[in-house]
């Protein structure tokens, strides 16, 4: 089992129950899923780009991503309906906890000029979204084997009802928020 999952069960549940006065353990917010999304607009011109993006995403997430396609044609972007334009992967369970551990302990500290995560990126329902500018912050990515530096979106979906509860949950996992 992942270290953070054990920490959640042993200490975080008790802390949050005490802080917010929950009457049941099931009321305590938990992380439900983590979604990684990589938009690859250049895939319209070159099909190889999508293969590289899928390879990188597979290495980072530990499971194969779903290739997302354009829902409708947009002449300005030179895309047609059905063109592959990105890839996404949803992590749950054990893989989710392992990814969260790597994100907090290894990847986030490797971000260049990092000054803390924005605390304003909550959506009003306790879910947190962040963007990463380069995939090379993850240790699974070999700098010499990548074709291009790409960013991705990381969305952490929680069962929290408010941003305050969501922030308290992520704070308990040592997320480095700006003070």
UniProtKB/Swiss-Prot annotation:
Note the PROSITE patterns from the entry: RIBOSOMAL_L5 (PS00358)
Domain of life according to the entry: Bacteria
Any GO MF annotation of the entry: rRNA binding
Q: Which Pfam families match?
A: Ribosomal_L5, Ribosomal_L5_C
What is a biological process (GO) this protein takes part in? translation
Which keywords appear in this protein's UniProt record, sorted alphabetically?
A: Ribonucleoprotein, Ribosomal protein, RNA-binding, rRNA-binding, tRNA-binding
* One term under GO cellular component: ribosome
**Subunit structure, interactors included:** Part of the 50S ribosomal subunit; part of the 5S rRNA/L5/L18/L25 subcomplex. Contacts the 5S rRNA and the P site tRNA. Forms a bridge to the 30S subunit in the 70S ribosome.
PANTHER family attached to this UniProt entry: 60S RIBOSOMAL PROTEIN L11-RELATED
According to its UniProt record, which protein family does this protein belong to? Answer: Belongs to the universal ribosomal protein uL5 family.
Job of this protein: This is one of the proteins that bind and probably mediate the attachment of the 5S RNA into the large ribosomal subunit, where it forms part of the central protuberance. In the 70S ribosome it contacts protein S13 of the 30S subunit (bridge B1b), connecting the 2 subunits; this bridge is implicated in subunit movement. Contacts the P site tRNA; the 5S rRNA and some of its associated proteins might help stabilize positioning of ribosome-bound tRNAs.
Q: What is this protein called?
A: Large ribosomal subunit protein uL5
